[in-house]
């Protein structure tokens, strides 16, 4: 079964997104998600050829990136379930894991899945993929070979070496621990993902709502000074009103007081 290579899609693209796209051209056996690319396996190669013709350079995703769709070269002819690591990736202590259920799967589930093969020093989940760091590269290699195409919570996962070790990032961040040095990356990367989709409405909506309660006062009365001037007369009027409210009753009381003095 010859796989179809798919590249240049957005980083947050999920396996189900590609399955829905390619299923229009024939029955898809499976989709293997990698780091920034994927392999799509059709049951019929004629359907795969049709998908390549129709989807190569096709605008896809929120950013309308042009997909790169062609017959896979390095993976062509590889039997299903082969756990061999991609030849173009340098072995590292950190593994890239994808295809697990992003809603149900937690960090402790992934750690429990990989810890039989060596000491796991760090696990980080980023949306629909994860990084698993081992104490040694040998343990990472052993885990990769043992867990490729294995299941985490009934989902078959794809495992490969990460492009760079966490230790290399630590060096750039002053030698801090993996969890600390990588946490800023975690905060930076999801932010564009989170803000990119809702931005047409969300980016504009909060500021008018936030400023609406105050801005009319400043707009109508020409700035803060005028706003304060507007408040001062109100305060004065309230004071005079208070005096006027008391004076009628007070006067009536005084008007009645002379009556007893006028009795014989």
From Swiss-Prot:
Q: In which tissues is it expressed?
A: Highly expressed in roots and flowers. A presumably longer alternatively spliced form is found in leaves, stems and flowers.
Basic and acidic residues bias (residue ranges): 211-254
**Principal subcellular localisation of the protein:** nucleus
Task: Return one Gene Ontology term, BP aspect.
Answer: mRNA splicing, via spliceosome
Region of interest called Disordered, as start-end residue ranges on this chain: 166-264
Q: Which Pfam families match?
A: RRM_1
Keywords attached to this Swiss-Prot or TrEMBL record, sorted alphabetically, are: mRNA processing, mRNA splicing, Nucleus, Phosphoprotein, Repeat, RNA-binding, Spliceosome
Ranges annotated as spanning the membrane: none
Q: What does this protein do?
A: Required for constitutive and alternative pre-mRNA splicing.
How the protein assembles, per its UniProt entry?
A: Component of the spliceosome. Interacts with CYP59.
Protein name, please? Serine/arginine-rich splicing factor RS31
Recorded source organism is: Arabidopsis thaliana (Mouse-ear cress)
């Amino acid at each position: 079964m010859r796989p179809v290579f798919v590249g240049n899609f957005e980083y947050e693209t999920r396996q189900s997104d590609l399955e829905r796209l390619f299923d229009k051209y024939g029955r898809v056996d499976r989709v293997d998600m990698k780091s920034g690319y994927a392999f799509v396996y059709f049951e019929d190669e004629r359907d795969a050829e049709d998908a390549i013709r129709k989807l190569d350079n096709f605008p896809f995703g929120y950013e309308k990136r042009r997909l790169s769709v062609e017959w896979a070269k390095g993976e062509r002819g590889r039997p299903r379930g082969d756990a061999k690591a991609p030849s173009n990736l340098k072995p590292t202590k950190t593994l890239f894991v994808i295809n697990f259920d992003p809603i149900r799967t937690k960090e402790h589930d992934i750690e429990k899945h990989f810890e039989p093969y060596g000491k796991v020093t760090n696990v980080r989940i980023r949306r629909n993929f994860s990084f698993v760091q081992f104490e040694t590269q040998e343990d990472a290699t052993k885990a990769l070979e043992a867990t490729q195409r294995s299941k985490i919570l009934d989902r078959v996962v794809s495992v490969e070496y990460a492009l760079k070790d966490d230790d290399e990032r630590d060096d750039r961040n002053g030698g801090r621990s993996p969890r600390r040095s990588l946490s800023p990356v975690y905060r930076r990367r999801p932010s564009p993902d989170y803000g990119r989709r809702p931005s047409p409405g969300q980016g504009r909506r909060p500021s008018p709502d936030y400023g609406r309660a105050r801005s009319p006062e400043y707009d109508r009365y020409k700035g803060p000074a005028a706003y304060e001037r507007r408040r001062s007369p109100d305060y004065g009027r309230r004071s005079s009103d208070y005096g006027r409210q008391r004076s009628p009753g007070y006067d009536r009381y005084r008007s009645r007081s002379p009556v007893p003095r006028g009795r014989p």
